[in-house]
Structures are given as structure tokens and as C-alpha cells.
């Protein structure tokens, strides 16, 4: 077995004494640093490589801190409108994953880079930490690499904001295949619109 097999096995056994200690120490360090910070190399090299990372020019990794918990509805001055059944503020569930939020924040802060993928690295009672892999689409090493230069196409600008990354497709419900998943694509909204539209074809 290769080295990455052992590394991934370490990360599978997160409750071992060594990993518990390591994760607690790392979490303390992450809390002292800004919410978005660049890291010199991935914390989980096996996971990063599986998701497309290469240790070459043009690839960068950023660690992003996201607050845990539900999403509170923004109601200015506490004014809610509509019927009482729809006036909830606090018990609402955000429809997107924390990982997709981390990708969005990294993509907004680093507008000149393209978000490739992301993965979980740590969490405590208050925050979750993710590492986001970004690609510099203007770098010659990226533009000349046939395995990654697809991301240089302008249609991939801010793919993280449009639910086109792996995390985005997951919260959109596009992971499944087959007859049990024919309501999810192309989107939940499109499916709702199709079902609500009355079609009256003219007979000739």
C-alpha cells in the first residue's frame, strides 16, 4: 500500500488518541487566525489529491472558517410580513451546506481564482473549518495542462456561486441517478415550475 492509504486511514480513525490531540491543537491554532487564510500545503494531502489538487504552480489552498448552527432570517427591526405561519425567524434550516458556504466566501475574496473543490478538516463547538482548492486560470502551467485547462473557460467563472462545484451539486440533490431521482434535475425550482404549469396542447 502507498503512503496515502495510511494517511487516509488515519483520518478515518478520528477518535484515536493521536488524532484527537492533533485536532484539538490545530483547532486552537485556527481560532487565533483570520477566517480566510492561505495554507502552504494541504492538511489532508490524500483528500486534496483525490479532489484534483496538484503540488505545482497555479494551485493554491485556503482554509476557511464557517460559523456552525442554523441560519437566522434577516428581519430589519424585527418586522416580519405575511401570515403567522410564515413569520418564523430563528428555527429555520439553511438549504445549503457549510462546505458550499466556505467555497462561496473563498471565491468572493479571491475573485481572480477559480474554485476547484473543497473538503472538511476540523470543527469545534462554534466553527467548522474547510480547505478550499483554488486554481489560477491565468497561469501558464494551468492553461497548458489538458487535465485542468477546462477551468480556464469563461463559463466556469464563479462556479461556486452557481452550485456547480461538488458541494453545490450535492445540496441541489444532483448526486443520485436512476428512476428514483428524476425530480431533482435540472433543479427543484424547474421541477416545481414544470408541475405547476398547465399545458393545454391544441389538437389538430
From Swiss-Prot:
Pfam families cross-referenced by the UniProt entry: Ribosomal_L15e
Any one GO cellular component localisation term in the record: cytosolic large ribosomal subunit
SMART domains: Ribosomal_L15e (SM01384)
GO biological process: cytoplasmic translation
Biased segments, Polar residues type: 193-204
Composition bias type Basic residues, residue spans: 172-182
GO function term, MF aspect, one: structural constituent of ribosome
Region forming the signal peptide: none
Bilayer-crossing regions: none
Keywords, ordered alphabetically: Ribonucleoprotein, Ribosomal protein
Coiled-coil regions listed: none
Region annotated Disordered, chain positions: 172-204
NCBIfam families tied to this protein: PRK04243.1
Assigned protein family: Belongs to the eukaryotic ribosomal protein eL15 family.
Protein name, UniProt field: Large ribosomal subunit protein eL15
Organism this protein belongs to: Petunia hybrida
